[in-house]
Amino acid sequence: MTTDPANRSQPGATAPLSDLHEQDARTGGADAAPAPTTSPVSTGPPERPPVYPQHPSSGTWHPVSTAGAPLSVRDVDAAASTAPSAHTSAQATARSSVRSPSETAAAGVVLRDLADEYAMLLCAHDPEAAARTGLPGGAILPDYSPAGLAERLSAERSLRHRVAAVDRSTGSDELLRRHLLERLETSIQFISAGEEGGNLGFLSSPFQQIARQLHRPPETPDRAGSEEADLAEAEAKWEDAWNLHRTRLEALPAALEGLAASLATSAEAGAIAPLSQVDVVAGQARDLASRRTRGLPEDLPATLHVQLQEADISARRAALDFASHLRTTLSPRAPQAEGVGRRRHALWMRRVLGTRVDPEETYAWATEELARVIAEQDAIAVDILGPGANAHSLNRHLRADPTQALRPQDYTIWAQEVADEAWDVVVGRVLDPPDGLGRPRVRLGESGAGVVRYEEPRGTGGERRPGVVLRSLADGERLVWPWMERTTVLHESVPGHHVHVGAHATSTRLTAWQRYLGSVAGCDEGWGLYAESLADELGLMPTPEDRFGRLAARRWRLARVLVDLGVHSRLPVPDDVAALPGASREWNRATVTAVLRHHTVISEGRLRFE
């Protein structure tokens, strides 16, 4: 196992599978290549956390000198014609250790050019990538058709060969090289195995990525400006937004037809989602169709109004046809058993973690760590309530007085104060993020999911929008408990994602691919977990109740690690899990629900979402 599970809460270490805030970060076949086995190195001052080379986006990046005669991308293309099909550690060892300064600088220039080329490739296939980077995009909606995936696969293979041919890099450029190789190789394997085209999931599979582009523009223009020119500009932008919305609606039938074709192709190759996931996405497609029945703003131009109505009807029909296709064509072929199996799960884990892990070893670690966390919770309960208390009794005690809770309308004020206090304690004293980062902003999103996420600044230097912590309440959630929320706010803001992911997004030392598109979810969440511990050390969790909340969040994540590994790698159900009310010796939905309910302090609405 490349990364010791016991080190996953440390800075830069790979996070448990459950900690991934978006399950969309990046075996077998000729494209397989071993993940590098390395020891942590530091690219910053000694007091900074170590940086793991297998996740170089965590590093401190420096401008590359262009002294000497740089290699052109054409030079690298020529060298790639004799390059092997995959990078290996043996090849890395065989590379010459004698490098002149001009060779090193030239390698850095070429690698940055190749990283920029990869960013452009991703933007050409995904409008969300284009929006995040500010780079030009070529797709109205994400392209998951067989032709689109084949085109991307071919381009990624070419890029991988050319990156592998750059063999004179050192320092941060060598980290960039290895980072590009790992992400490219993992993506190539994922597409080749049919997993990209066969991906159906509840939260971040291709269907959701397509559907997210269909959000409605504002119902009226922003007429806040008092000047006539300002009003005219606002109305023009508003009309442009509705025109773009029309274009996306018109593109939906082709996008869903392409996705349906890829799902069929992947199913033939054995990459098919469990029946439960097929049914969930079919329901989401029906919901998408029903949401399209709202009326259009009255003051749109008449021609655009008619075009939108026609596009809306076509989009509704396409969504319903896609739902019907899933029910009638894919559902009969989908396995009823939950999970994808050990071989496929290994590929998914590498995509999300950026390295390979041993399922049994990680399963054993999670079991031991869960027991340790419960013991710490019980100890805090005894300190607060006295002998005989445990985590469950303290949880009931802390929730017994609703006057200690926050109302939803008060959440953002409190959470912003927590984030601002953390900024004052951390920035300039412990961490030095880029000058353009700025303080994070906390917002309350639409109710429904009951989750919280971080959205990085958009635009170089964060000029267009600051980093945002967005909290969504679960359906029916009326109270928010500060002792439980503090650790989450710190995880998402400071010293968590805002000074890690946000710092990447605003760093002028990194390429656009590194800033926005090359992150490894396991690395990002590894930092978030480390940030919670760091916040505790810095006095940002001042009460025993706050520390109990941090342990409760960790317990929840560890329980999800057990579930993820147990369900997808099909590992044995532990005795203590099988003994829980409603559980059995099989990793089915009843057993999963029993585990999550036993180890969680979240609402029933959030539990159902999970």
Feature map (PLM): residue ranges:
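Short hydrophobic alpha-helical segments enriched in small aliphatic residues
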Residues: 22-25, 78, 88
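Short linear/disordered segments characteristic of secreted peptide precursors
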Residues: 13, 40, 48, 58, ...
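Compositionally biased, low-complexity flexible segments
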Residues: 26-36, 83-84
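N-terminal acidic, proline/glycine-rich, low-complexity intrinsically disordered segments
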Residues: 1-24, 64, 71-73
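N-terminal maturation segment of proteins
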Residues: 2-5, 80-83, 87-89, 93-610
